[in-house]
């Protein structure tokens, strides 16, 4: 009798993707984040769907509707806390996933990598428009500051900003369209995830050594399904701990006040996962320059495959590149800290130095380290 799992048109796709998929035998826990991101996406879509059933995207009632969800809807407080902290978990997994890709040279699968960068940008856009929806002080002023950056574009900037706003400032029209974007984007992300996996399964997974693993493959199920299940339990443990014990730990107290266009908060700052980019934006005293640096800080990921100079794929056996990678990690943590600080000395100069170092590491130092390591492997003396 033929196995339905291997013959049915739909089951066959699932089988080739999650069950009989040949996977390298040595992939570490750093390869768990892909599945965790998929789970985060499902959690966000489900909690978001239930929130959307009770939310109203009107400037007069948006803030009250969120309070109503937390007070009057059955387990509304839990759904809201899971959704808000789920976003933080999503970005934590995203950053670790991208970091893994850089460390182990996964970016050499160019199609998979490029779709991944597009996914990162789409998730960032989704999180930004989502943060505006509760219509608190930081929601309103965050939206005002970030959308205002469009006006830095020469000639068309102001028109573009007003087009996004649907008026002359962030108002009812802006909130309504941001809700529409926030609802549709996760489904676009889901479609992109399918394409991301499609390209990944064309080549198969990379592995920590960076060496072709074809000589030693094992089936995805049961080995990596059980490993992913462990990752899932740890993810849920952290998410539930956050949502149940300290749901407002990563939020901003200003967002407990309804949006007031006449009262600017003392320190306007985005959620923690955007602070590194915000610090780079603020470190340049010119508006257009700051916007370009902000874009470059993310889009630089697209050119990483072309900056790979080493003869080895992974950093596993490249100590100089490893050192630079961990300096880059520390630098990003520094930028995140600076992004949350007021614009005054010494934070300004620290932010500027960290921003310069960020681009220097990726564009100059890491490619040079790769070339030097090649030389050390085959010295000419």
Swiss-Prot record:
* Pfam families xref list: Cytochrom_B_C, Cytochrome_B
Additional comment: Heme 1 (or BL or b562) is low-potential and absorbs at about 562 nm, and heme 2 (or BH or b566) is high-potential and absorbs at about 566 nm.
Stretches that traverse the bilayer: 33-53, 77-98, 113-133, 178-198, 226-246, 288-308, 320-340, 347-367
PROSITE patterns (alphabetical): CYTB_CTER (PS51003), CYTB_NTER (PS51002)
Binding residues annotated for heme b b566, in chain numbering: 97, 196
Q: How does it assemble?
A: The cytochrome bc1 complex contains 11 subunits: 3 respiratory subunits (MT-CYB, CYC1 and UQCRFS1), 2 core proteins (UQCRC1 and UQCRC2) and 6 low-molecular weight proteins (UQCRH/QCR6, UQCRB/QCR7, UQCRQ/QCR8, UQCR10/QCR9, UQCR11/QCR10 and a cleavage product of UQCRFS1). This cytochrome bc1 complex then forms a dimer.
Molecular function per GO:
metal ion binding; ubiquinol-cytochrome-c reductase activity
Q: Where in the cell is it found?
A: Mitochondrion inner membrane
Q: Which GO terms describe its biological process?
A: mitochondrial electron transport, ubiquinol to cytochrome c
Residue numbers binding a ubiquinone: 201
- List the coiled-coil residues: none
Under what name is this protein listed?
Cytochrome b
Q: Which residues bind heme b b562?
A: 83, 182
Query: What does this gene product do?
Result: Component of the ubiquinol-cytochrome c reductase complex (complex III or cytochrome b-c1 complex) that is part of the mitochondrial respiratory chain. The b-c1 complex mediates electron transfer from ubiquinol to cytochrome c. Contributes to the generation of a proton gradient across the mitochondrial membrane that is then used for ATP synthesis.
Query: How is the cofactor bound, as the UniProt entry phrases it?
Result: Binds 2 heme b groups non-covalently.
């Amino acid at each position: 009798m033929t196995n339905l799992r291997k013959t049915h048109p739909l089951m066959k796709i699932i089988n080739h993707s999650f069950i009989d998929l040949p996977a390298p035998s040595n992939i570490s826990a750093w390869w768990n984040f892909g599945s965790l991101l998929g789970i985060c996406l499902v959690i966000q879509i489900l909690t978001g769907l239930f929130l959307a059933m009770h939310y109203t995207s009107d400037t007069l009632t948006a803030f009250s509707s969120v309070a109503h969800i937390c007070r009057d809807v059955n387990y509304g407080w839990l759904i809201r806390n899971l959704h808000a902290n789920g976003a933080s978990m999503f970005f934590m997994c995203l950053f670790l996933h991208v970091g893994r890709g850089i460390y182990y040279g996964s970016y050499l699968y160019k199609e998979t990598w490029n779709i991944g960068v597009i996914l990162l940008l789409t998730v960032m856009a989704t999180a930004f428009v989502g943060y505006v929806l509760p219509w608190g002080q930081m929601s309103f002023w965050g939206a005002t500051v970030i959308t205002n950056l469009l006006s830095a574009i020469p000639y068309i900037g102001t028109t573009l900003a007003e087009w996004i706003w649907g008026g002359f400032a962030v108002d009812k029209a802006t909130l309504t369209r941001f809700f529409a974007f926030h609802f549709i984007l996760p489904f676009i992300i889901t479609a992109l995830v399918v394409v991301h996996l499609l390209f990944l399964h064309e080549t198969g997974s990379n592995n920590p050594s960076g060496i072709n693993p074809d000589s030693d493959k094992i089936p995805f199920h049961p080995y990596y399904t059980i490993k992913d299940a462990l990752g899932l339990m740890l993810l849920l443990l952290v998410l539930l701990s956050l949502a149940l014990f300290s749901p407002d730990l990563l939020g901003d107290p200003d967002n407990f006040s309804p949006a007031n266009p006449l009262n600017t908060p003392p320190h306007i700052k985005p959620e923690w996962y955007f602070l590194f980019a915000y610090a780079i934006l603020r470190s340049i005293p010119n508006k257009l320059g700051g916007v370009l640096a902000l874009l470059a800080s993310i889009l630089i990921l697209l050119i990483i495959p072309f900056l790979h100079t080493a003869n080895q794929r992974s950093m596993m056996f490249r100590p100089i590149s490893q050192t630079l990678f961990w300096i880059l990690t520390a630098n990003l943590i520094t930028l995140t800290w600076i992004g949350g600080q007021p614009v005054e000395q010494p934070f300004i100069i620290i932010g500027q130095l960290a921003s310069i170092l960020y681009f220097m590491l990726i564009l100059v130092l890491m490619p040079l380290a790769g070339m030097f390591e090649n030389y050390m492997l085959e010295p000419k003396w």
